[in-house]
Amino acid sequence: MKKIILIIFSLYTITASGQQFFQTTPASQKWVDKSFKKLTRKQKIAQLMVVRLSDRRGKDVVFLEPEVTRYIKKYDIGSVCLFQGSSILQAGVLNRIQAIAKTPLMVCVDGETGVGMRFADVVPLPDQLTIGAISDADLAYRIGKAIGLQCKRVGIQVNYAPVVDINNNPNNPVINYRSLGEDKYKVSLFGSNIIKGMQDEGVMACAKHFPGHGDVSVDSHLDLPIITKSMQALDSLELYPFKQMIKAGVGSMMIAHLYIPAIDTIKNQATSLSRKNVTGLLKETLGFKGLTFTDALEMKGVTKFYPAGQASVQSLIAGNDMLCLPGDLKGSIKKTRKAIRKHQLTWNDIDEKVHKVLLAKYNLGLDTLKPILIPSLSEDLNKDVNKLKKEVYENAITLLRQDNPSILPLSASKKVAYVGIGIAGPNHFARLLQENYKADCFYFDNTTDSIQARKIISDLQKYDAVIVGIHQYKKFPANNFGIAKAAVNFADKIEKMDNSISFVFGNPYAIKNFSDARNLVACYEDDSLMHAVAVNLLKGTQQAKGRLPVTVDADFHYGSGILSKVLFPIVDPKTAGLDGTILNRIDSLANNWENSGTDHRGTDPKYELRYIFFSNRVCPDSENNIISQINVRSDI
């Protein structure tokens, strides 16, 4: 009986967790009804709009506070989305506009790598493709939790993350490294863990981009991508993670701008504007009950065919709840009212969506909104980010090939050269190699001519080991990630040397250019933390544990990765939780035994020296037990 009750309780908990943002109580119903009754018809429509709060104009970041303030006062808009700027500036703006809002604003952010993706003063967390290289799903949960804590601290209620598109097209110009990889099971597991981490902190996650943006070759910011797969193919791959996100209780989903004839044959109509996709497939067939956000309606994948507010109307007809960045707010409201008069929509449709949004606002804590505390804000947002980021890097770094067993770990006694490709001078990786190996450094960038390149190749012949670092290439695959053919040819000449090892710092898809390397490591990102992890791998104090989250070429498929050798570290006894005096006694006994000049080998147990290995979790009493197990002659 107890077991049955426990199972029922567990199922209830999972279901309740999935509906945490849409639970109705007498208190929530009272707040929703009160807020709803204050809204005019124009304001009801505006409650469904997400407005941009900042923009980049040239080199400058411009806060649109005056415009947004006008929208709040005139229309009582429902939501804003944060983009560029610093945390302190953003928080100041949010405090001011929340103070004048008649209905509290739902604050959103497009923060796939945390708020550091948008705030200049906050360190971003790892890219999702880097996370896809690790094996520990609990680490994905902790990343989600860290992002949730950041969002809460700076007054954000909804984060447009994670990306759960399966990136099965290496040339994808818009998703690519933003994905968790190409395996639907891993994408689903890690995506659901990130969601749970965020939502456990009371921040609504948003799985994107439904019904799957991973297999495109056109950027939807610039045009409308077309996917010609059958419904069966979509169901078996692209839709799989989204089904799992629904089971995991994700609070919202973002709808992609794609043209998929298998879902809707209306020519040039994006899936974000398709009733068959949003209402028919997502809500009715898959049973999703959370909020739906359109992808940004200012993107050309939509505006090319539905300009000047018409995209907003069609998004609502499709069944979306929230319209992200509609651009022409006044025109969107005007055309929505016109669509209602034409019976394309009803006020009941609008009212239902507004009630849903208000209920989410209540459950996100907007009924008791407090100002964001500015002091120590930046410090709080950065707290423990580098520690968590380093842990991800340590679990992600991937050894793909090791033809020369002596190159890894690399002895500090070797004569070492470092060749930085893509940089003109020393970076953190170069400085660490100089510090740890006294490495001589050479650099190859777009200013290096063929004569200089030949001289570098010639000079490298006198070294015991040559370390190659591939740096500062672009994250997206256009124009071969910005990697020049001359750089690829130069690297190839070095990589054919048995004593060379290549570290590729960035998008792993670029490894196709360096896959002939005799010794090869995928590093995923190009920052000082990853540089330090890579040097520790060279030294043997860090093990390569990662696996490729995507297929790179015929040599390196999804899941490729070799566990590297790791040297037993020398640590201070106190660090390992041990009593140094007892260890010194063991050393003394062992040295006396070894220096006695007597052969104690044999079967007599009183001359047996047992070498006992123990972890740093050994309890203090065990140390005395170790002493008691060492039997030596009393006269030694």
Give the location of each predicted region.
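Active-site-adjacent structural elements in enzyme catalytic domains
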Residues: S87-P104, A137-G155, I350, H355, ...
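Catalytic loop of the DD-peptidase/beta-lactamase superfamily, centered on the K-T-G motif
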Residues: L567-I636
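Active-site mouth loops of central-metabolism enzymes
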Residues: V51-F63, Q128-Y141, D223-L237, K300-Y306
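Structural recognition of the beta-strand scaffold that forms the well-ordered cores
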Residues: Q47-R52, G78-F83, L105-V109, V115, ...
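Preference for extracellular/luminal or secreted protein segments
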Residues: Q19-R70, E284, Y306-I570, K574-T575, ...
